[in-house]
């Protein structure tokens, strides 16, 4: 997605060979126009999948998930990382290791909002080692729902998360795939495009 790649190049900051800071438009301050375009792109890519619900994780996955849900006409449920006084019982639970925060979080979804009749699109802001996506998949599977695919805003293709998910037969659609963050520079995966005659 060209507009996203340009935003990453112009406003993203490489902090190390494996950390990209995008808090100017995605995971702290949010650019709503960009989120709208991201939502449209996810909706376009998954429109034939009969999605009934989008599942994401708090907090950075919420904005792109809501915009995609708006385009698809479905609801979003986000996995919580913290216990809530209003959500105590009747929860699906999984453990997720955060690469960025270097900690394990227990994530949960209420059983009241997802069931075996749902066809789910999972959306998240980043895909690195795949732990968040695997945790979300576990929650969806515990509910007996089917997974249509996973939509990722930014995939760090140099880490093994995408490979792990694809090897399990999961459809992963990433809007920007980063090949490298070496030497403080963002390099994107280059996909061959069919020649138009």
From Swiss-Prot:
Catalytically driven reaction(s): XMP + diphosphate = xanthine + 5-phospho-alpha-D-ribose 1-diphosphate
Record-listed E.C. numbers: 2.4.2.22
Residues annotated to bind xanthine: 20, 27, 156
This protein's record includes keyword Transferase: yes
Binding site for 5-phospho-alpha-D-ribose 1-diphosphate: 128-132
UniProt GO cellular component terms: cytoplasm
Chief localization: cytoplasm
Superkingdom of origin organism: Bacteria
Keywords: Cytoplasm, Glycosyltransferase, Purine salvage, Transferase
UniProt KW Glycosyltransferase keyword: yes
Protein's GO biological process: purine ribonucleoside salvage; xanthine metabolic process; XMP salvage
Xref: InterPro entries: PRibTrfase_dom (IPR000836), PRTase-like (IPR029057), Pur/Pyrimidine_PRTase (IPR050118), Xanthine_PRibTrfase (IPR010079)
Any one GO molecular function term: xanthine phosphoribosyltransferase activity
Pfam entry (one): Pribosyltran
Biological pathway: Purine metabolism; XMP biosynthesis via salvage pathway; XMP from xanthine: step 1/1
Location relative to the cell: Cytoplasm
Subunit structure: Homodimer.
Protein task: Converts the preformed base xanthine, a product of nucleic acid breakdown, to xanthosine 5'-monophosphate (XMP), so it can be reused for RNA or DNA synthesis.
UniProt xrefs under NCBIfam families: PRK09219.1 (NF006671), XPRTase (TIGR01744)
Family: Belongs to the purine/pyrimidine phosphoribosyltransferase family. Xpt subfamily.
Name this protein carries in UniProt: Xanthine phosphoribosyltransferase
Organism: Bacillus cereus (strain G9842)
